[in-house]
Structure formats: structure tokens, C-alpha cells
């Protein structure tokens, strides 16, 4: 099944740029990188695909140094003519050859007319070993699981997509979009699983797909363990992480006897691979956003569908009407972060939450989001506006009057006031509009 991915537009811009550079497409395993590039290849007259897990395909990079000789060897290997233009060369599984990664820069320096894209599984580890490229020689894009809008496009629900992109949101579409978003919240955005679900419309059929994905990730990380002890630790971390509470501590993680340093190293490996991100807080209420890595982080999973499967929640979720109140709000927080991550394709975006920088009292705001010169606080919870105590503490010290709450409710803007009397504007936004936060922040500030 071919999906409509928003990253495709970025690929078209890259193709049209007369000064394009070799492109590395980054992202976790099984998010659809190879499928997307094969779709994109139809924009070219000539397409050559290499898989460096194959000995025949990796040999030119391993045995030759001159980039023009490498290219001639590829043409010979693939039985391809030597086209002058409109050629896309796709180097898949490039993590298998550090030398091939280093050679990418020479396509730009010596063969700038060629379009070259590289991708791979656990590519982040290989890139880390290779080190940085000279500035301006390589471009990067990031592909994520399907977001809610891409899920709707896959279901060919164009009316829902139109409503989702209407600002402000039309009142008649609320019920329908909530139901569709709850469906997406159960399934998640992994392409193989979404394709299976759309074809059969049967959640029960998906368990084997989820389990296979989890096992693939576990097996992948075993490759990066230097001994059996590290292998066991990585497997423990990836299996235990879904069960952890909102914020984690490396010390005694999962009630284990592993040392804080060992757990931290393992979690940073998972973060590097994009499977489980470490999300750190800021204590700032104004720009710049400076995260504090000494404070306890949250864990953000690659995909909410995988998390639901790991926690065996999908059956319960079939009857849920308000995700704010389900599983202590963990699933909706994960999902909103996933939506925000997915709209950032040009760099590795991580959500940030806020904590008060005082030991005498604790306060947390679920998200802060940069808009121009403002840091907008965002809560992901229901309840009366007057009971949002952490948000009140943020608004008491920030330099603007705008706050947002994502919940299972209709869109409205209310005049609010903190306990100490600070007045502010609160935008109540349906949580299915999380990916549209940039548009709604602009609309909110522009109209209120």
C-alpha cells in the first residue's frame, strides 16, 4: 500500500533545488523510508536502487575510492546506461558501510547533477561512528510514523482531512473527528500495521504485526551490545520502559539492580535510534528553551500503537470517549507528542515540558511550544480552568497572556485568571488538532 506522506513535498523541493546535496533520510526502522523513496523515484527518468546488505551492491564502495569509478561500477552492476540527468540513486541499508557514508560527500563535490538518497536501519549509530560531515555537503530529512492526517488520507477520508485543515475547526465535524482520532490512538501510525488494519478492519489481526516489530527492535539492539550482560540490559530496558510512570529515574529503573550509569547509557541508545526518546524539562518561561538534563526525564515512544500493544490496552480503548481520563493521561500525552514530532521533518525535534525551578514546591506543565518570541504553555488535561495550578504558576511569571489546553472538548477561548489574580487567555483545543498547533497558535494570538 502506498501512503501519502507529507515528507514527499520536502523531497520534491529537494529535487527542484539546483544546488541539492546528497540526502540522508533518517528515521526509525519500519516507518516507511524505503517505500517512500520508491514512490518518489517515479519523479525521475532513471532509478538505481542499491541494498548494501547485498555483497554485490556493497562491493563498489568497499573496493573503490574514486567516486566516478564507483558510479561506473554501479552502472555496470545494474546494467544501467550512463544517464546525464534525471537520475535518482538510492543507497539503502547504508549503515552496513562506514566507507559508503563517508563517500556521500563526493557525490556533491564531483557529481552535483546526480540525485542521491541514502537510508538505513539504525543509521543513527553508523552516523555517530563516522562523525560529522564537512558543513554544507549533506542534507537530512526525518521520516516518522504516519500522523493522524496521514492516517485519514490512508483511509481516503477526504472530508475529515478538509475539516481538520479548516481554521477555526467547523462545529459539525467534532464528533466524527473525535471518533476517528480515537481509532488512530488505538492503531498508531506504523505503516505496515495501518495497511493491515485498512485492508481487514480487524484490530485482532494486528497483534502478530506489533509483536514482530517489537522483536525486530529488540534484535536490532542486541547487535550493539558488546557482551551478553549488555544484551540482557538493553532487552530489559526496552521491555520495561512501557510500564514506567510519567517521569523516570535511572536509579533502580524498573525496580532493577542495574546501576544508574548503565540504565542511562541504554536509554540513550534507544533515544539515538528513535525508539524511546528521553524528553527533558525546561525551567524557563521565556526563550531560549534550555532543557535541564539533570532533572528527571519522560519517555516518549516511537508509536502509540506499539505502546498500547506493550501495555495490552487496545481492548479497553475501544470504548473510551475521553483519552484525558484514560490510563492516567499517559496515552494522550504520548500521542500529542507523537503528533508534534511528526510535523518536524527537517531536524530531530523533541517536545519539551516545564517544571518549576524551586525545591519548596513542585509544578509541571505538560508542554511548552515556541512561537516567534514567545514560549506557549500547553496542558493536556480536563477539568475547570481554575484548577490548573501548574499552568497558573507559569502564567504568573511569563511575559505574555496566552495558554492552551488540549482536551476532549470543543474549541473555545476563555478569559481566565490565576489564583493570585494574573489574567490570561486560555484556548481550549480538541486534542485531535495537536498537529495543527502552529496554525492555531497563530490564529489564537492574531484574534485574541
Q: What are the residue ranges of the model-derived segments?
A:
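N-terminal pre-Walker A segment at the start of P-loop NTPase domains
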Residues: 1-16
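Conserved lysine of the Walker
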Residues: 33
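Accessory nucleic acid-recognition modules appended to NTPase machines
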Residues: 195-364, 369
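Conserved catalytic cores of phosphodiester-cleaving nucleases, focusing on short active-site segments
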Residues: 340, 365-384, 403
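Domain-level recognition of nuclease-like catalytic cores that cleave nucleotide substrates
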Residues: 411-448
Amino acid at each position: 500500500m502506498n501512503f501519502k506522506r507529507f515528507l514527499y513535498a520536502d523531497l520534491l523541493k529537494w529535487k527542484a533545488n539546483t544546488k541539492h546535496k546528497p540526502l540522508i533520510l533518517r528515521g526509525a526502522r519500519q516507518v516507511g523510508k524505503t517505500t517512500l523513496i520508491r514512490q518518489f523515484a517515479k519523479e525521475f527518468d532513471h532509478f538505481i536502487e542499491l541494498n548494501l546488505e547485498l555483497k554485490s551492491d556493497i562491493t563498489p564502495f568497499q573496493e573503490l575510492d574514486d567516486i566516478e569509478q564507483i558510479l561506473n561500477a554501479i552502472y555496470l552492476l545494474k546494467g544501467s546506461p550512463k544517464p546525464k540527468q534525471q537520475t535518482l540513486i538510492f543507497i539503502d541499508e547504508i549503515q552496513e558501510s562506514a566507507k559508503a557514508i563517508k563517500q556521500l560527500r563526493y557525490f556533491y563535490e564531483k557529481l552535483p547533477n546526480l540525485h542521491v538518497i541514502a537510508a538505513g536501519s539504525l543509521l543513527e549509530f553508523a552516523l555517530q561512528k563516522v562523525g560529522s560531515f564537512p558543513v554544507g555537503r549533506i542534507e537530512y530529512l526525518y521520516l516518522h510514523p504516519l500522523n493522524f492526517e496521514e492516517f485519514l488520507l490512508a483511509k481516503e477520508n477526504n472530508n475529515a482531512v478538509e475539516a481538520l485543515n479548516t481554521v477555526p475547526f467547523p462545529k459539525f465535524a467534532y464528533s466524527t473527528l473525535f471518533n476517528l482520532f480515537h481509532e488512530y490512538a488505538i492503531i498508531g501510525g506504523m505503516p505496515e500495521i495501518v495497511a493491515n488494519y485498512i485492508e481487514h478492519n480487524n484490530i485482532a489481526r494486528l497483534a502478530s504485526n506489533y509483536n514482530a516489530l517489537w522483536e525486530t527492535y529488540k534484535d536490532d539492539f542486541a547487535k550493539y551490545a558488546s557482551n551478553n550482560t549488555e544484551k540482557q540490559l538493553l532487552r530489559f530496558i526496552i521491555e520495561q520502559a512501557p510500564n514506567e510512570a510519567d517521569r523516570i529515574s535511572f536509579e533502580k529503573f524498573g525496580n532493577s539492580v542495574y546501576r544508574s550509569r548503565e540504565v542511562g547509557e541504554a536509554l540513550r541508545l534507544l533515544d539515538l535510534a528513535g525508539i524511546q526518546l528521553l524528553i527533558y524539562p525546561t525551567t524557563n518561561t521565556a526563550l531560549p528553551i534550555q532543557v535541564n538534563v539533570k532533572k528527571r526525564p519522560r519517555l516518549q515512544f516511537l508509536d502509540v500503537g506499539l505502546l498500547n500493544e506493550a501495555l495490552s490496552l487496545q481492548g479497553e480503548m475501544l470504548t473510551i470517549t475521553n483519552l484525558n481520563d484514560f490510563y492516567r493521561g499517559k496515552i494522550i500525552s504520548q500521542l500529542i507528542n507523537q503528533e508534534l514530532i511528526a510535523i518536524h521533518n527537517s531536524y530531530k525535534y523533541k517536545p519539551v515540558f516545564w517544571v518549576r525551578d524551586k525545591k519548596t514546591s513542585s509544578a509541571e506543565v505538560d508542554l511548552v511550544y515556541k512561537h516567534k518570541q514567545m514560549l506557549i504553555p500547553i496542558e493536556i488535561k480536563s477539568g475547570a480552568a481554575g484548577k490548573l495550578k501548574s499552568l497558573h504558576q507559569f502564567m504568573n511569571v511569563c511575559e505574555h497572556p496566552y495558554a492552551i489546553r488540549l482536551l476532549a472538548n470543543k474549541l473555545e477561548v476563555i478569559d481566565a485568571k490565576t489564583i493570585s489574580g494574573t489574567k490570561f487567555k486560555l484556548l481550549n483545543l480538541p486534542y485531535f488538532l495537536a498537529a495543527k498547533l502552529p496554525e492555531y497558535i497563530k490564529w489564537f494570538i492574531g484574534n485574541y
